[in-house]
UniProtKB/Swiss-Prot annotation:
Belongs to the sugar phosphate cyclases superfamily. Dehydroquinate synthase family. This is 3-dehydroquinate synthase. Its EC number is 4.2.3.4. It comes from Photorhabdus laumondii subsp. laumondii (strain DSM 15139 / CIP 105565 / TT01) (Photorhabdus luminescens subsp. laumondii). Zn(2+) binds at E184, H248, H265.
Length: 366
């Protein structure tokens, strides 16, 4: 069992990483007998994990209600959020309730935002079941739902009480979802840790094969890096946390334009990271050699390195200008400077961005 702390003063919380965690009543120790819990999951995960987690909670004499949502990015919406509120109210959940997000990034983001809003804020616990959620979205308190005009546009910074990573969940993860999570893993190496990037180059085959030792190390290192960044810049005020958005400005444009769920988040971020690398090259701030290292590693993870074939470069910028990093009408992009380091830039001309996107086309739709 591994434990990492996200250090935020009184709001600090643990990330626990272990196999079989969902079967362990002691893992829910902060909850007390008789307390209410609302388990939020989706129709795909409910048959796999809902009964197991409910039984574990009931062993600890915790009162459990559940809400089962449709599965998919397109359901990370205000209307589905309202379904969670309705379930809480119909079951008379009061301010001392705890919401548990049992799922991937969609469930975690939506449940966290529900917790931030319900009766002005209730406790919630992240139980991430996808690699992407385990290494990234479950840690750091970013909660949100999507809007037709943009991804994660309606949300709040709201930290969980704890994050419980059960490595056994990866055994049921579809290959495409595993690759999607690996995009966020690779991102950490590009922006923060060149040694970790090199380790990924040496161990990608083991990760794809779900080697226990390699995967445990990978998840632990990603959570350590994310925890350090969140502790230093929780609400993206200094620019440090914004570096975690490498590839996301391009990637969110792809997700929004193509329709939520057509491209998985990690797939869009993967193509976006190559676009960011090409942009950095065009301003002579990144090497072709490092770009090729990124492309090779993404391809080994079975990820796209080009944008959608039917999305022209001019379709990107309107979405990118709605990005949450835009300030005073200026596009701000996270660009790598070398493997292991990145900068937040606000001086990139739009024609440079378009030229970089052009270099990353075409790609057959997924």
């Amino acid at each position: 069992m591994e434990k990492i702390t996200v250090t935020l003063g009184e709001r600090s919380y643990p990330i626990t990483i272990a196999k079989g965690l969902f079967d362990d009543p002691s893992a829910f120790a902060p909850l007390k007998a008789g307390q209410q819990v609302m388990l939020v999951t989706n129709q795909t995960l409910a048959p796999l994990y809902l009964a197991k987690v409910k039984a574990t909670l009931q062993q600890a004499r915790i009162r459990v209600d559940e809400v089962i949502l449709p599965d998919g990015e397109q359901y990370k919406s205000l209307s589905v959020l309202n379904d969670v509120f309705s379930a809480l109210l119909e079951n008379s959940h009061s301010r001392d309730t705890t919401l548990i997000a049992l799922g991937g990034g969609v469930i975690g983001d939506l449940t966290g935002f529900a917790a931030a809003c319900y009766q002005r804020g209730v406790r919630f616990i992240q139980m991430p079941t996808t690699l992407l959620a385990q290494v990234d979205s479950s840690v750091g308190g970013k909660t949100a739902v999507n809007h037709p005009f943009g991804k994660n546009m309606i949300g709040a910074f709201y930290q969980p009480a704890s994050v419980m990573v059960d490595l056994n969940c990866l055994q049921t993860l579809p290959a495409r979802e595993l690759s999607s999570g690996l995009a966020e893993v690779i991102k950490y190496g590009i922006i923060l840790d060149s040694a970790f990037f090199s380790w990924l180059e040496d161990n990608m085959d083991k990760l794809l094969a779900l080697d226990n030792q390699a995967m445990a190390h990978c998840i632990r290192r990603c959570c350590e890096l994310k925890a350090e960044v969140v502790a230093a810049d929780e609400k993206e005020l200094s620019g440090l946390r914004a570096l975690l958005n490498l590839g996301h400005t391009f990637g969110h444009a792809i997700e929004t334009e193509m329709g939520y769920g057509v491209w998985l988040h990690g797939e869009a971020v993967s193509a976006g990271m190559v676009m960011a690398a090409r942009t950095a090259q065009l301003i002579d701030n990144f090497s072709e050699q490092d770009t090729q290292r990124i492309i090779r590693l993404l391809e080994r993870a079975n990820l796209p390195v080009h944008g959608p074939q039917n999305m022209p470069p001019e379709a990107y910028l309107p979405h990118m200008m709605r990005d949450k990093k835009v300030i005073a009408g200026k596009l701000r992009l996270v660009l790598p400077t070398k493997i292991g380091k990145a900068d937040l830039r606000s001086d990139i001309e739009h024609n440079c961005v378009v030229d970089a996107i052009l270099q990353c086309l075409p790609y057959e739709n997924v």
